[in-house]
């Protein structure tokens, strides 16, 4: 079973038999965001990623956990969530629009840079402190990155959104 309170991503969970059950898992994700409006160069993301990964990781060790299952899941998985704010301003400041497709290239480059720098910061931290205990359960342990799990069918949906109806292939 998988869930996340904000429902933006799916995180592993295991059922609890009671609130003190330490065999269950409650998914928690410690969050932060890059203020894209303050980013001038994509290279700025390298240092910022290092800082945010280390800060959030340190927070995992000293925050309070109301239930053993929440602590267990967090300590074993060390899940971090890093998003963005000020996206619309970032696009405007760079002279592109979301509505006409001119932002597609910048958006792709920006989020590719964010993903790269966050992964690099996480790898650097793992080299220093070791992998999280549940690393072997992840796609990363299999050598898969998020881009490797991309479903091409989504392209059909994105290309067809201007139609009044849509039928996806059944094969």
Name these PLM-found stretches.
Residues 36-41, 85, 103, 140, ...:
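Short capping/connector residues at structural and topological boundaries
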Residues 18-19, 76, 157, 166:
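Generic recognition of flexible, low-complexity loop/linker segments
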Residues 119, 123-163:
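Short glycine-cluster motifs
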Residues 38, 55-67, 113-125, 129-133, ...:
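Short secondary-structure junctions and interdomain/linker hinges
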Residues 164-170:
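Conserved small/polar residues in nucleotide/adenosyl-binding loops
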Residues 76, 80-133:
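Extended, well-ordered alpha-helical scaffold/bundle regions in very large, multi-domain proteins
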Residues 1-74, 84-91:
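Function-dense linear segments that define catalytic or interfacial modules
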Residues 65-75, 102, 130-140:
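Short coil/turn segments at secondary-structure boundaries
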């Amino acid at each position: 079973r998988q869930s996340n309170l904000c429902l933006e991503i799916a995180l592993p969970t295991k059922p609890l038999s009671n609130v003190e059950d330490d065999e269950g898992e409650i998914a928690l994700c410690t969050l932060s965001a890059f203020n894209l409006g303050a980013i001038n160069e994509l290279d700025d993301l390298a240092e910022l990623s290092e800082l945010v990964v280390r800060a959030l990781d340190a927070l995992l060790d000293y925050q309070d956990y109301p239930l053993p299952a929440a602590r267990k899941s967090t300590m074993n998985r060390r899940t971090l969530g890093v998003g963005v704010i000020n996206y619309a301003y970032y696009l405007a400041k760079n002279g592109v629009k979301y509505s006409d497709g001119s932002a597609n290239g910048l958006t792709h480059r920006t989020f590719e840079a964010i993903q790269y720098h966050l992964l690099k910061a996480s790898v650097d931290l793992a080299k220093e402190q070791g992998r999280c205990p549940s690393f072997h359960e992840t796609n990363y342990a299999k050598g898969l990155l998020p881009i490797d799990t991309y479903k091409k069918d989504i392209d059909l949906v994105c290309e067809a959104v201007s139609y009044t109806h849509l039928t996806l292939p059944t094969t």
